[in-house]
């Protein structure tokens, strides 16, 4: 190769070039072809067709024009991608079986439900439909931005100022690179009602929107079976909706019946459906049909299926549902472009995006109209000044040699305005008066004066001028009010939506059938105790509790799970397959899930990422999981207590979290440098114990905190922390009625004796040597709780909860454990029972279970004993308790009776 050409060559890595080029191609397909914009619900080709028809005057009130002319205009001005793609898009916009509200009014053959192709574009004619005008209304008032077209000769709108949520009303479908969208059509009236509800309350729950948006409304009618698919689609943006055609059974004499299909599912080819039924009859997969014919006409669908004598029609119909597309699924993927990027959105997010867009449109329109009104008022003020000084105006004009000199002389002169000063103030004109209360004409005003007709000098015209100025003043005041008041702007938005509804809303075509289609599958789930493990990397799994064997204290443990990429266990708890769980995330959101929906694994398995199970946002991860009682009747008297690392706490009603949609809800507001440590159910007569990693603890009554209804509150100060210290655990304890003196006296009784008293063993009051009576000792023994404290270096101890005195929240607390370099920092604090077992997990994935009865009971201010032999650089990261309910022994089978969990984040 000569130097002439080699000097222009730039060597590149072919792998990098292919990646970059393919990414460019993918984004081009996503943004410029296949995915609709959430604001107007249109892809670029549809937007260009409608705008081109609008610009060409091909309106609903005008005569039809040849489709070929429309396609040519679109291709020549905006869309240089071939006429067939443009015409196919135009054809679909005319089909009343494809769009709920067709955007193009067609005349001629535009295809059919049988899959027939439309006639050539030279034969068909089109014009905008009436509802399409609502997509372009106010487009000439500065409402949306315009872009240069492909050759720089024209401008086209980046989006249409749609007055109704077209994305939901007409739906959309498309396949891009690596993604697809499939949004069903809806009823206009229902969608606008949902928009109005959102305008009235931006915090409305999606389930409340479902009260008005019953589900998709397909242009072909048919039925939707069940609401589970609808709920999933609206809550998460993805779902599968079961569609079923409508059929009637008629008696035709001689003990014979016929099935009449009158509606078919959306996007099902009717001719292929009939062929499929015939094929199934031929293969004898459907039996009992003697005749089949398509009797459909312009009045609607009618597929006649004649049955043999004495055949049960319901059985045949069910066979047709099972074997053909008379019953099929619509896979919903509510993917659309938001801020130029593809995003899967739920129902509320789509509505919110549309409402936000309409706010911008109305604001831009108001600014445009305000400027126009002010410009007009400015000219009228000039005319008013001229009429007030008409003699001098005429003299100047007559004395000038030409128009330019007259205009300049008018602009140079200072004019009295005292007579019209009220009009100037009325229209809020920004003129600059000099010290003597005079002003000069602007060039615009001077030009208008020179063009003024003599008839404007009459008294009637003067009065009309004043009335025009007053009218403009009213308009200007209204425009300023709209710009200053979001409330007024939303009122206008809502009024315009309601007008569209009144003009174009039609009855629902698609019925929704409830019943066995939404049958709960939980009855089929076998009850089994599971160990749920969550890793810091966001992986979760459930393992049958029987997979773990019991070991004695001091053992080396077994491999609990395979740790990859230095992932460590964050949380472990035990529950039934039917246990409901609340998942709390680092950004303060809460999600709800039943335990059986978690991935089943083995002790060495890693599980699945929670982002594949819950609809987590970018940079969002689960920090806490709270198992709840299976019986929701028990929730009525429970509260939820939140605790954060910075020592904040909040008490809320558990019932506030009873109805949580699939995409979650806000649970608590967190500061940027704070994180959620624990969330637990509690009762009013119970106590809260906060513990820190530095070995401090603080106990206070639940009733000392008021219930906070706001889910966006960050709560109140629970504990004052030292520098570098943080809360690592929150424990719920029983309330106590005894005095501190009585508790101190009780604690002088040896713990072995206290345990025996609690088990019912008789005791000698005098031998105990305390001033308490027998009833008090017995009551305190039966109510005594023990607090387990575990450190990162494997040390642990049990202490009586009576040793933690009750104080006011907000204090610094008392010593919980004597920590040092040998013990390390505290990682877990929780109440335990005598027959509990301890489960510890280290950052290397090692797991051990040991009997708590072998863990020494000591006072608060002690360091405890070694619970777990650790290797170098090994730390305890998770502590859980499992209560034994079956026979004891080293390899006993264990089930859950109570559970607490703590983690080191």
Swiss-Prot record:
Cellular localisation: Cytoplasm
EC numbers for this chain: 5.6.2.2
A Pfam entry, by short name: DNA_gyraseA_C
Source organism, top-level taxon: Bacteria
Keywords: ATP-binding, Cytoplasm, DNA-binding, Isomerase, Nucleotide-binding, Topoisomerase
Gene Ontology CC annotations of this record: chromosome; cytoplasm; DNA topoisomerase type II (double strand cut, ATP-hydrolyzing) complex
Sequence motif: GyrA-box, positions: 551-557
First-level EC class: isomerase
Domain Topo IIA-type catalytic: 35-524
Similarity field: Belongs to the type II topoisomerase GyrA/ParC subunit family.
Cited NCBIfam families: gyrA, PRK05560.1, PRK05561.1
Protein name: DNA gyrase subunit A
Organism name: Rickettsia typhi (strain ATCC VR-144 / Wilmington)
Encoding gene (name): gyrA
